[in-house]
Curated annotation (Swiss-Prot):
Residues 1-8 form the signal peptide. It comes from Lablab purpureus (Hyacinth bean). Belongs to the leguminous lectin family. It comes from the Eukaryota. This is Flt3 receptor-interacting lectin. Dimer (alpha/beta)2. Tetramer (alpha/beta)4. Its main location: other.
Length: 272
């Protein structure tokens, strides 16, 4: 039997079906821009072609309350329509990610780090590493879902283009094969259930079989109470366009009423 739950007013919801050039409720970091009603998360040259060694991030400006205590937890759903494309016949790199991080999170390295992590093995909460686009220390306090287009064996990547779930490190906890299609719009549906503690990912192209992935994690044990959600992407020596066409997000902060009632009964009996 599931515990009773009450929805809190402390929820976050937004939906972008297009992106204006001066989108005030978004924070742009690194090379990310908004142009022609889409997000270009990594840099393009004057001809609209991707460039090497680029990193960009876009965060929603309003912080999200992820948890209050062990009895007040947030569930969320986000849907991203995005396109990874290249005009070149060479390999592409490096990928795009949805991430959750502290509100003061800043961009990190390009290439295989996807603008998210200061180094491949970081498991602590901070680093003194610096990126070319910032002088502030980048934090590894990040949970991310990556769509990784470049295989980095040194980072523990499988030998195929994949979706991965990352927790405080670019080394994914779990991965699933992802059949990337050049220039086609992919849909990613990412959700977190605060009751089952499961982070789930489904991604698909129109008319194709979806790729699915999940990982059980208690987000309140690895992330602070207040966070921001964002999108991040990078290129290395090889390159790609990382284009976001739309993005929606909704969250619900739930209170575990049954647990609180039991705690109150215990306290009452103690007083008597």
């Amino acid at each position: 039997m599931f515990p009773s739950k009450v929805k809190s007013a402390q929820s976050l919801s937004f939906s972008f079906t297009k992106f204006d050039p001066n989108q005030e409720d978004l924070i742009f970091q690194g090379h990310a821009t908004s142009t022609n009603n889409v997000l270009q998360v990594t840099k393009l040259d004057s001809a609209g072609n991707p460039v090497s060694s680029s990193a960009g991030r876009v965060l929603y400006s309003a912080p999200l309350r992820l948890w209050e205590d062990s009895a007040v937890l947030t569930s969320f759903d986000t849907i991203i329509n995005f396109e990874i494309s290249t005009p070149y016949t060479s390999r592409i790199a490096d990928g795009l990610a949805f991430f959750i991080a502290p509100p003061d999170s800043v961009i990190s390295y390009h290439g295989g780090f996807l603008g998210l992590f200061p180094n491949a093995n970081t498991l602590n909460n901070s680093s003194t590493s610096e990126n070319q686009t910032t002088t502030k220390a980048a934090s590894s306090n990040v949970v991310a879902v990556e769509f990784d287009t470049y295989l980095n064996p040194d980072y523990g990547d499988p030998n195929y283009i994949h979706i991965g779930i990352d927790v405080n490190s670019i080394r994914s906890k779990v991965t699933a094969k992802w059949d990337w299609q050049n220039g086609k719009i992919a849909t990613a549906h990412i959700s977190y259930n605060s009751v089952s503690k499961r982070l789930s990912v489904t991604s698909y192209y129109a008319g194709s079989k979806p790729a699915t992935l999940s990982y059980d994690i208690e987000l309140h044990t690895v992330l602070p109470e207040w966070v921001r959600v964002g999108l991040s992407a990078s290129t290395g020596q090889d390159k790609e366009r990382n284009t976001v066409h739309s993005w929606s997000f909704t969250s619900s902060l739930w209170t575990n009423v049954a647990k609180k009632e039991n705690e109150n009964k215990y306290i009452t009996r103690g007083v008597l």
